[in-house]
């Protein structure tokens, strides 16, 4: 049944729209929503993208080591290490020269730094994708869009793309892998082939914010492309820790890039850009016992997520696009407005989703649904089925 809003829901929806407009192309946080629209009772956050099981794992360590271990005061009171010191901790763990690792206050800080400092006159950005790569472009940078095909489920047509890049001759290109908002994934061998064909491009930016949710075999083994940097020095690999590890609140990410680029960044204000809590997390991240536990919950989360997507695909009003991330791009097929659907789910069921009507490169009524815990995913599925019965 077509989604319809009553007068009360329309009034709340307008408040939601106003908050969204104030947030630009990003969704307002659940804290902002709750504060500004107290009528809402948000129960499940299916908008923001993180692994809830990894959050629980981190909280357990934080409680045992910092709170119960009486070390939290030190983390809060004393200055954290400088960028290069924390970078060495990560570099030693991933097997990269420390001179090629840069720590960011979230991946978004790294994206902005890269766009402002290294991207020149022209960059190619695939669409639909994460908006910051065109929003952060300098005024003198020509952003050229490469449209991913809806008929191909927004997967990259590699040969067509390579020809497009050759004809445009940019100084920079961006590949988000898996892509946001559709979760499209370029496997290791195909990515390596792309890099080998684009050696003439000055900067190849590879955003791997969701790579821990992708897999290439039935064992869900982790994928590691860091070593490609050793072969292709024009790459800039950006990693967000927020999604994989469910720690968006502490703002942490890192990048792999050439030494001269990092040297330039450190001369321009990134010397002390990590908090004590983010440093604690990164030092925890490189410990074998923690990482082994994380890898176990990562694999379990992937299985639950893919099961969730299969169940979503069984809803006749939906087209669910194949995803190798922890979110699914969903097209509404019954004529319902994506704005009305997202509003109804939030107001009536307390489930916060993301409408994609502000995404450049999408034509139609699209929403993005993040995977949560098994219990939360079941509640989302039940609520969706209920809303279409009204």
UniProtKB/Swiss-Prot annotation:
Catalytic activity: O-phospho-L-serine + H(+) = phosphoethanolamine + CO2
Keyword RNA-binding in annotation: no
Cofactor section: pyridoxal 5'-phosphate
Pathway: Capsule biogenesis; capsule polysaccharide biosynthesis
Highest taxon above the source species: Bacteria
InterPro entries noted in UniProt: Aminotransferase_I/II_large, NHTrfase_class1_PyrdxlP-BS, PyrdxlP-dep_Trfase, PyrdxlP-dep_Trfase_major, PyrdxlP-dep_Trfase_small
Keyword Lyase belongs to the record: yes
Modified residues (N6-(pyridoxal phosphate)lysine): 243
Entry keyword set: Capsule biogenesis/degradation, Decarboxylase, Lyase, Pyridoxal phosphate
Enzyme class: lyase
EC number: 4.1.1.-
An MF annotation (GO) of this entry: carboxy-lyase activity
UniProt record, GO biological process: capsule polysaccharide biosynthetic process
Annotated function: Pyridoxal phosphate (PLP)-dependent decarboxylase involved in the biosynthesis of amidated D-glucuronic acid structures found on the capsular polysaccharide (CPS) of C.jejuni. Catalyzes the decarboxylation of L-serine phosphate to ethanolamine phosphate. Less active with L-threonine phosphate. No activity with L-serine, L-threonine, L-aspartate or L-glutamate.
Family: Belongs to the class-I pyridoxal-phosphate-dependent aminotransferase family.
UniProt-recorded name of the protein: L-serine phosphate decarboxylase Cj1436c
Organism: Campylobacter jejuni subsp. jejuni serotype O:2 (strain ATCC 700819 / NCTC 11168)
Source organism phylogeny: Bacteria, Pseudomonadati, Campylobacterota, Epsilonproteobacteria, Campylobacterales
